Amino acid sequence: MADKMADIKSISIATGVIILNLLLGHFFAPTGIMLTPVALIIATVLIVFGTKDLKPIFITLAILGLIIFHDVGLKLYSGGTHDRQGLGWLHLMLFMGLIPSYILTVVGIVRNKKTNWTEKSISIIIFPLLMAGHLYLFSDLGLGRHYWYDWN
């Protein structure tokens, strides 16, 4: 029971980090975009090393869910004018956080002694496949939006 509470706590804190960064991006642009790598790495570390009872597939899906939530949130609600130049910058910051997040996820999954290699392999392979699918479908999401406040 204590491990399940630790898992819930880690995932909740990781979600809070992502939401905080999205709020920073909305109200204090471009801070949220610039802190994307930091937020993604912190969320990944919290989930990979802070959970004890989750299977590798659920670890991968939880991390991917938060990364995709962060990406969609920034593309739709980040402050400023959303144009192609900003989208390129956002994708650069996304990949600067995505690569270390993937490496940390692989390390955490491989270190897990409770599961077999088939499940570990599937968990490692679906991360880039699902992320590539997301970027293929939603790479232009949010173009043309405009959010502006006097203080940013």
Q: Where would I find each of the regions flagged by the language model?
A:
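C-terminal membrane-adjacent module
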Residues: 101-152
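Short, aromatic-rich membrane-interface segments at the entry and exit
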Residues: 27-39, 55-59, 118-120
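Short alpha-helical packing/oligomerization segments
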Residues: 71-109
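Alpha-helical transmembrane segments of polytopic membrane proteins
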Residues: 22, 29-43, 86-101
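Canonical alpha-helical transmembrane segments
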Residues: 37-61, 69-75, 104-108
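Juxtamembrane "helix-exit" motif on the non-cytosolic side of transmembrane helices
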Residues: 21-28, 71-83, 137-145
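Alpha-helical transmembrane segments
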Residues: 6-22, 59-67, 127-130
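Short juxtamembrane and helix-loop transition motifs at transmembrane-helix boundaries
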Residues: 1-4, 15-29, 50-58, 82-86
